[in-house]
Swiss-Prot record:
Gene: ruvB
Main localisation: cytoplasm
Natural source organism: Methanospirillum hungatei JF-1 (strain ATCC 27890 / DSM 864 / NBRC 100397 / JF-1)
Family: Belongs to the RuvB family.
Region (Head domain (RuvB-H)): 255-337
Positions of region (Disordered): 1-20
SMART domains per record: AAA
Catalytic reactions on record: ATP + H2O = ADP + phosphate + H(+)
EC number, as in UniProt: 3.6.4.-
Subunit-level organization: Homohexamer. Forms an RuvA(8)-RuvB(12)-Holliday junction (HJ) complex. HJ DNA is sandwiched between 2 RuvA tetramers; dsDNA enters through RuvA and exits via RuvB. An RuvB hexamer assembles on each DNA strand where it exits the tetramer. Each RuvB hexamer is contacted by two RuvA subunits (via domain III) on 2 adjacent RuvB subunits; this complex drives branch migration. In the full resolvosome a probable DNA-RuvA(4)-RuvB(12)-RuvC(2) complex forms which resolves the HJ.
Record keywords, A-Z: ATP-binding, Cytoplasm, DNA damage, DNA recombination, DNA repair, DNA-binding, Hydrolase, Nucleotide-binding
Enzyme class per UniProt: hydrolase
Protein function: The RuvA-RuvB-RuvC complex processes Holliday junction (HJ) DNA during genetic recombination and DNA repair, while the RuvA-RuvB complex plays an important role in the rescue of blocked DNA replication forks via replication fork reversal (RFR). RuvA specifically binds to HJ cruciform DNA, conferring on it an open structure. The RuvB hexamer acts as an ATP-dependent pump, pulling dsDNA into and through the RuvAB complex. RuvB forms 2 homohexamers on either side of HJ DNA bound by 1 or 2 RuvA tetramers; 4 subunits per hexamer contact DNA at a time.
Name the UniProt record assigns to this protein: Holliday junction branch migration complex subunit RuvB
């Protein structure tokens, strides 16, 4: 199984690395409009001695939704419990998380779009009235009890905002979408992370990594570590532009941040379907990847850089994508892999 170095999805081994996550809004790089909105909301809540309104973050994976949730709790001097939508199977699981929360604490639910309808319905009164209704027992003897909750704030994160029902979505007072980062912002992030991790890097080396990180800090930090491995084994231990370029080439990451899986999608559309339009399910079968993964993980960046178009008839590649696929360096990279 091939490792995808430019996947925005978190790798398990990355949990064990020293944290490069910022702890305060002032240290969070990029997403300026979101930081401004959160600064106003947090300052207002503090002055009013009230909990924050419930918050919903949306956007592609790897952009900092989880980091922002922890920063918000830190800025409010409050505790945060974290979980994810697929984990919350039973009402009792949710109650076990909500009942210990103290006034102005936080519950963060990642992949909140994957909550079951039953859990969503239990959250309605929890979000509005700070109570939850639980069914105790079975059959004729079953009864409903109401448990009071402290004033808490729910923070949800989703990559698929459209999958949340309107009644649930409307209960969030603050809804914010994170967008992909500019290369200049990612260069600052790479430089900052290198400093925290003790990795020697030049400004040109940081910019080279940033330019291939698909607008995603998680990918930038991952490529930084892999480039450092290469610098230690094949270089002098420091990452300059040449080392970064050579290391990323060896990892199969081209100048635009595309890997073999991205190029496979583009090549299937270009060569097998004459540039499109072609349906998502057909692409999925051709490249051997789930439709949802293609739509959530691959397509946002390909669309962002102008290589892919979504039309009512299906997906189409652009002339820019054809030019990129025809680039000699890209052809060499495909052969290398």
């Amino acid at each position: 199984m091939q490792t995808r170095f430019v996947s925005p999805v978190n790798h398990d081994e990355e949990q064990d690395e020293p944290s490069v996550r910022p702890g305060l809004l002032a240290d969070f790089i990029g997403q300026d409009s979101i930081k401004d909105a959160l600064t106003v909301a947090i300052t207002s809540a503090r002055k009013r001695n009230k909990p924050l309104d419930h918050i919903l973050f949306s956007g592609p994976p790897g952009l900092g939704k989880t980091t922002l949730a922890h920063i918000i709790a830190q800025e409010m001097n409050s505790h945060i419990e974290t979980t994810s939508g697929p984990v919350l199977d039973r009402p009792g699981d949710l109650a076990a998380l909500l009942t210990p929360l103290k006034d102005r604490d936080f519950l963060f639910i990642d992949e909140i779009h994957r909550l079951s309808p039953v859990i969503e319905e239990i959250l309605y009164p929890a979000m509005e009235d700070y109570t939850i209704d639980l069914l105790i027992g079975e059959g004729p003897s079953a009864r409903t009890i109401q448990l009071p909750l402290e004033r808490f704030t729910l923070i949800g994160a989703t990559t698929r905002l459209g999958l949340l029902g309107s009644p649930f979505r409307d209960r969030f007072g603050i809804i914010l979408r994170l967008d992909l980062y500019d290369p200049s912002e990612l260069t600052v992030i790479v430089t900052r992370s290198a400093g925290i991790l003790g990795i020697p890097i030049t400004p040109e080396g940081a910019a080279e990594i940033a330019g291939r990180s698909r607008g995603t800090p998680r990918i930038a930090n991952r490529l930084l570590k892999r480039a450092y491995d290469y610098a230690i084994v094949r270089g002098t231990g420091s990452i300059d532009q040449n080392i970064a370029n050579t290391a990323l080439f060896a990892l199969g990451v081209d100048q635009k941040g595309l890997d073999i899986l991205d190029r496979r999608i583009l090549e299937v559309i270009a060569n097998d379907f004459d540039g499109g339009p072609v349906g998502l399910k057909t692409i999925s079968i051709s490249v051997g990847e789930e439709p949802r993964t293609i739509e959530d993980v691959y397509e946002p960046y390909l669309i962002r850089i102008g290589f892919l178009k979504r039309t009512p008839q299906g997906r189409m590649i652009t002339s820019a994508a054809r030019d990129h696929l025809g680039n000699s360096h890209t052809r060499d990279l495909t052969s290398f892999l």
